[in-house]
């Protein structure tokens, strides 16, 4: 069996929910707060560590009630969320090889998908130890192939290997990790899924209701 390198996950929960009208992460989804779906998707031994990063006291309370590590902050930018989350994971797992950034508002994202993404980056093939550090700068994002369309749908979660950690810790104010997509296009890879709804986020009450209906069909 090949050794799996350590991968962590930052659950992004610092958004303002402006389009939703209230904190969407706490909205009911199949009988529990929507954020609990992200807890379930990341509840896997394939992840060496995980942490929720939020500006919401209520979200922090929910995390603590479910024994999910949480970091509460009051900083404004997406770059702050990335830096705080990655820094916290590196304190827990200094040898971290990859870091996944997962939004808390994609309730149909499933655990198998998270495990697949973590596994693709974290495989320690024998040759990997002999490769140059440049090959530890890969980026993996989730995607769905659209029939008769050469351009796939792409989205989150996104996983960055450790060669990019320093740049993630020093992103421009207000910017997220997507700036590295443009900087290193040859290093961006897509992990394809069969269900496009895993990419869907619940930005409005109407979108939440549609996704909940889809989830109930699978029960």
Residue map of PLM features:
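N-terminal glycine-rich phosphate-binding loop and ensuing alpha1 helix
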Residues: 2-57
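Conserved alpha/beta core of the MobA/IspD/sugar-nucleotide pyrophosphorylase nucleotidyltransferase superfamily
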Residues: 2-5, 9, 166, 170-219
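Short beta-strand segments
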Residues: 12-14, 53, 102-103, 143-145, ...
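Short aromatic/basic micro-patch
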Residues: 28, 108, 158-159, 190, ...
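Hydrophobic residues at beta-strand termini and immediately following loops
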Residues: 29, 71-73, 142, 191, ...
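Short, surface-exposed acidic-centric catalytic microdomains
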Residues: 48-84
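Conserved beta-loop-beta/alpha segment of the NTase-like Rossmann-fold superfamily
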Residues: 75-169
């Amino acid at each position: 069996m090949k050794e799996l390198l350590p991968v962590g996950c930052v659950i992004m929960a610092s958004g303002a929910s402006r389009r939703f009208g209230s904190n969407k992460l706490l909205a009911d989804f199949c009988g529990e707060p929507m954020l609990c779906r992200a807890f379930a998707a990341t509840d896997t031994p394939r992840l060496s560590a995980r942490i929720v990063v939020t500006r919401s006291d209520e979200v922090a309370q929910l995390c603590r009630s479910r024994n999910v590590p949480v970091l509460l902050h009051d900083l404004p930018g997406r770059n702050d969320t990335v830096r705080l989350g990655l820094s916290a994971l590196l304190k827990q797992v200094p040898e971290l090889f990859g870091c996944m950034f997962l939004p808390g508002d994609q309730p149909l994202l499933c655990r198998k998908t998270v495990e697949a993404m973590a596994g693709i980056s974290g495989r320690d093939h024998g040759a990997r130890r002999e490769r140059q550090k440049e090959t530890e700068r890969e980026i993996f994002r989730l995607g769905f192939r659209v029939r008769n369309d050469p351009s796939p749908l792409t989205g989150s979660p996104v996983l960055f290997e450790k060669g990019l950690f320093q740049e993630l810790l020093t992103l421009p104010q207000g910017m997220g990790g997507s700036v590295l997509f443009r900087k290193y296009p040859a290093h961006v890879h897509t992990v394809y899924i069969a269900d496009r709804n895993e990419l869907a986020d619940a930005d409005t009450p109407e979108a939440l209701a549609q996704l909940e209906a889809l989830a109930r069909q699978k029960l």
